[in-house]
Amino acid sequence: MVDSYDDSLDGEKSKSQVKRELHALVDLGERLTTLKPDLLNKLPLTDALRRALADAPKHVAHIARKRHLQFIGKLMRDQDTDAILQLLDQLDASTRQYNERFHNLERWRDRLIGGGDDVLEKFVGEYPDADRQQLRSLIRQAQHELAHNKAPASSRKIFKYIRELDETQRGLR
């Protein structure tokens, strides 16, 4: 009779599991090397890891960069990776929200330029502080530029104006 014995029941991790976890730490360290210094300061990191992350851009040769990332991965073993991942997820979520809001404003700009008074009325309904006269003037200029293949200066002005309106309405200004 052959007994099958499962090592995972002992509570010890398999060699493969340990390797996967170490590779995940190296990947997290590589992700940290792409962050700006002011964002890194918000993370709970040791001084040695901060120095290693600051030195990362100096290593441009492939093997040197790989070796340095392995070193960062080694330093990551002493970190609270759950807290770091949680903060990185919050940063990603805020970036996603910002991009979503930005794309929404671009869609408004495009609809205003391509649409008529009904689109303008919908916009003013959503942004009551909007100056209709200024918007109409900018829309006419943008339509003229579009028809004559000129640079979209008025289109940029419309976007800037509706972005300022949005920020004011959200209390960011």
From Swiss-Prot:
- Supply the SUPFAM superfamilies for this chain: PSPTO4464-like (SSF158710)
Which compartments is it annotated to reside in? Cytoplasm
CDD domains linked to this entry: YjgA-like
Q: Which Pfam families did the record assign?
A: DarP
- Biological-process GO terms, alphabetical: assembly of large subunit precursor of preribosome
Glycosyltransferase recorded as keyword? no
Q: Which GO terms describe its cellular component?
A: cytosol
Q: Which UniProt keywords apply?
A: Cytoplasm, Ribosome biogenesis, RNA-binding, rRNA-binding
Superkingdom of origin organism? Bacteria
Q: Which GO terms describe its molecular function?
A: ribosome binding; rRNA binding
Q: What is this protein called?
A: Dual-action ribosomal maturation protein DarP
